[in-house]
C-alpha cells in the first residue's frame, strides 16, 4: 500500500513535492509506522528500486543477458511513465548512487578474481568505474524508454548487457 501510494504521488506531484505526511495519509499508514521502516522518502525510494537495480547491476558479471534482466526491463517498460519520471528528475542522482554501489560490489568480486590471470587488475578505483557504468546503464534505459516501441525488450536487454560488459572488459580485460 505504501509503495503504491509512493508511486502514485511521484507521478502526480513529482518527487520533490512528495512529503512523508502526504504519503502516509494517502497510504493510511501512521507516520511513526513509516519511520519504523524508513528513515525518510530517500530511503523509501532506494527500497522501492533496489530489486530492479540489483538485476541491472548483475549485467556486469553475467556473460549473457539474464532472464531476470528481461523481466526487469519488461516491468520498466510497463511502468514507463514512472520509470521516466525517476530517470529524468531529481531522483536520477539517487538511482545512480544506489546502482553504483551495487555495481561496485559486482566489480569487487571480479577484482578479487583478478589475482589470477587472465583477468587484469582494474585500471581505476572501483567506485569511479561503478559510477561510470551506473550512469551508462541508466542512460541506456532512459534512451530506450524515449524511443518508440520499435525496440523490443530483448533488443534493449542485449544492448544494455553488451554496453555494460564492454565497460567491464575495458576495465578488467577480456575475461572480466
Predicted regions and their residues:
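Amphipathic alpha-helical interface segments
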Residues: 5, 9, 136-143
Amino acid at each position: 500500500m505504501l509503495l503504491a501510494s509512493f508511486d502514485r504521488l511521484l507521478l502526480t506531484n513529482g518527487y520533490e513535492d512528495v512529503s512523508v505526511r502526504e504519503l502516509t495519509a494517502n497510504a493510511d499508514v501512521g507516520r511513526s509506522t513509516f519511520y519504523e521502516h524508513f528513515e525518510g522518502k530517500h530511503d523509501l525510494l532506494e527500497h522501492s528500486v533496489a530489486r530492479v537495480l540489483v538485476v541491472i547491476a548483475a549485467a556486469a558479471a553475467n556473460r549473457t543477458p539474464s532472464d531476470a534482466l528481461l523481466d526487469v526491463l519488461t516491468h520498466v517498460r510497463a511502468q514507463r511513465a514512472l520509470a521516466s519520471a525517476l530517470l529524468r528528475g531529481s531522483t536520477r542522482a539517487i538511482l545512480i548512487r544506489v546502482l553504483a554501489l551495487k555495481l561496485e560490489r559486482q566489480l569487487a568480486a571480479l577484482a578479487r578474481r583478478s589475482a589470477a590471470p587472465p583477468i587484469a587488475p582494474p585500471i581505476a578505483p572501483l567506485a569511479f568505474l561503478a559510477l561510470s557504468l551506473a550512469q551508462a546503464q541508466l542512460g541506456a534505459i532512459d534512451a530506450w524508454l524515449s524511443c518508440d516501441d520499435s525496440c523490443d525488450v530483448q533488443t534493449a536487454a542485449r544492448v544494455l548487457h553488451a554496453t555494460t560488459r564492454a565497460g567491464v572488459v575495458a576495465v578488467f580485460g577480456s575475461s572480466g
